[in-house]
Amino acid sequence: MSASNVSLLHETCRQVAAGGCAGLVEICLMHPLDVVKTRFQVQRSVTDPQSYKSLRDSFQVIFRTEGLFGFYKGIIPPILAETPKRAVKFSTFELYKKFLGYMSLSPGLTFPIAGLGSGLTEAVVVNPFEVVKVGLQVNRNMFTEQPSTFAYARQIIKKEGWGFQGLNKGFTATLGRHGIFNMTYFGFYYNVKDNIPSSKDPTLEFLRKFGIGFVSGTVGSVFNIPFDVAKSRIQGPQPVPGEIKYRGCFKTMETVYREEGILALYKGLLPKVMRLGPGGGVMLLVYEYTYAWLQENW
């Protein structure tokens, strides 16, 4: 193996390790908000006696009826997926960015286009895990009463198969969710970071990067949430058991808009922003600092 190939492999391993650490830290800190977000997104009517009245009400009800572990339902699939997911997210972003560099595009275009490519690639890896995660998150039984992650995955495969009606349902919505988020997230972060002077003070530099990452995650959440709502409706339980109401991504958006109004496409926005705002800052900081440490020590 040539020296250049060894160097490329070494660089990829650093990206995988740094991305995995970033994903693990972010998911462990922010998963409770993801559970709340998903519950809001699958609600169809405020008149439903099981509907949450507010963000505070959702936390109180989940804690009272399902216990502390209720906030960590469905956490195993994202943990299992985080290392390959974040490895794909960051390594393919770097790969697409390098490829686009040969096309003489401006940085203003290179970063969002590379982000879009990384998001679409990431969606392919993560979608089966998302199907299992959403199914577990919307289960309102006590944590100890619900099926295990692997038992639930086997149940989906047995009943619905591996395809777009089974373990890969909601695939187009996942493509839209991740593609648009990464396009906005990376595009905003790197373009803004390059235009705001860095600081020699480590604390100020940390806050500068975290602040830009926070805003990047927030903006990405606002732009991609209609796809996230569609994904939750398709991958979650259908209104009538045995009857599939939500199928394609855009058809689902149309149905939600027609029956519930435009604001229904933004259900769960507050917990999503509360998660992916600070989560976006945390993830990029953990990635950058871990990657820098690995460059110095490995």
UniProtKB/Swiss-Prot annotation:
Catalytic activity: 2-oxoadipate(in) + 2-oxoglutarate(out) = 2-oxoadipate(out) + 2-oxoglutarate(in); hexanedioate(in) + 2-oxoglutarate(out) = hexanedioate(out) + 2-oxoglutarate(in); L-2-aminoadipate(in) + 2-oxoglutarate(out) = L-2-aminoadipate(out) + 2-oxoglutarate(in); glutarate(in) + 2-oxoglutarate(out) = glutarate(out) + 2-oxoglutarate(in)
Residues annotated as transmembrane: 16-36, 69-88, 112-132, 166-186, 204-224, 276-296
Any single GO BP term: lipid transport
Tissue expression from the record: Widely expressed.
Gene3D superfamilies: Mitochondrial carrier domain
Domain of life: Eukaryota
GO cellular component, one term: mitochondrial inner membrane
Solcar repeats: 10-99, 106-195, 204-293
Pfam families named in the record: Mito_carr (PF00153)
Cellular localisation: Mitochondrion inner membrane
GO molecular function per UniProt: alpha-ketoglutarate transmembrane transporter activity; antiporter activity
Family stated for the protein in its record: Belongs to the mitochondrial carrier (TC 2.A.29) family.
PANTHER family: MITOCHONDRIAL 2-OXODICARBOXYLATE CARRIER
Protein name: Mitochondrial 2-oxodicarboxylate carrier
Organism of origin: Rattus norvegicus
Gene responsible for this protein: Slc25a21
